[in-house]
Amino acid sequence: CEWIHLIDDPFYIWVPNDHPAVADGVYDIHRIYDDSYIDLYPGRESDGSLMFKSYDINPPIRYKTSDAFAAYSMVEAGLGVTTVNGVSINQWHGNVTALPISPSYNVPIGIAVPETGRISPAAKRFRDFALVFFEEHKRRVMDIINDNDKK
């Protein structure tokens, strides 16, 4: 299988608007021990679980859900904080702030395709189309991510 890297998506943490870290503009990931953590996709390998594993952190899980909107709503209700991908931080608008984490953590976004000798002609055409399409629209994708960074 061939992995084709397209972009790195910065990782964030959703906190209630009145959370002390909002004034800092960044969330020190070790601060998680002082907060109630809402585990999104519990028991599964997720971007959040991989991020915590990379920092050797075991967050104090208070609530669990497999629904991103439920996690967002719990954060908005002041029940805790949760991690979120940069491309997803503006799905809903409420009393929640998405803060970049420190140290920063990025999630690679790309496509996986069979090796050149094993890829079907249709899959090869789609791969080629997707790569051209992404390259032509990469600026727009970056604008969306950078716009998220400002919110």
Where are the regions that the model predicts?
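Beta-alpha-beta core module
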Residues: 1-10, 24-25, 70-118
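Short beta-strand-to-loop elements that line the ligand-binding cleft
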Residues: 39, 58-67
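Secondary-structure junction motif
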Residues: 21, 28, 33-56, 119-127, ...
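A local structural motif
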Residues: 53-62, 96
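Short helices/loops that flank or line small-molecule/ion binding pockets
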Residues: 30-31, 53-55, 68-79
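Short secondary-structure boundary segments
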Residues: 17-18, 43, 85-88
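Residue-level recognition of the GNAT/N-acetyltransferase active site
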Residues: 16, 40, 114-115
